[in-house]
Amino acid sequence: MAKQKIRIRLKAYDHRILDQSAEKIVETAKRSGASVSGPIPLPTEKSVYTILRAVHKYKDSREQFEMRTHKRLIDIVNPTPQTVDALMRLDLPSGVDIEIKL
């Protein structure tokens, strides 16, 4: 029989909230008896937006804004039913995007 694995990808703009959420997930999974690998930091995605400061002319005067998306990967190997139930009841901050693959 093949090993079961739950793969959780977390995304957030703030890395502190992301790390706190990852620690909550790892702690919950370990408490319920599953083995955990991670959190693995994935490359940070950086989007840069350049806009003109002036409305009408002065093209040389520009302003740049950037948005960084931090990502983490957590693998839960051989999860028990208690692990899945505990993860479903876990309350995480609203700034974290969670993607779960079974």
Swiss-Prot record:
SUPFAM superfamilies: Ribosomal protein S10. It holds the Pfam family Ribosomal_S10. Coiled coil: none annotated. One of its GO terms (biological process) is translation. It comes from the Bacteria. Keywords: Ribonucleoprotein, Ribosomal protein. InterPro entries: Ribosomal_uS10 (IPR001848), Ribosomal_uS10_CS (IPR018268), Ribosomal_uS10_dom (IPR027486), Ribosomal_uS10_dom_sf (IPR036838). PROSITE patterns: RIBOSOMAL_S10 (PS00361). One of its GO terms (molecular function) is structural constituent of ribosome. Disulfide bonds: none annotated. GO terms for cellular component: small ribosomal subunit. Involved in the binding of tRNA to the ribosomes. Belongs to the universal ribosomal protein uS10 family. Part of the 30S ribosomal subunit. This is Small ribosomal subunit protein uS10. It comes from Bacillus subtilis (strain 168). The gene is rpsJ.
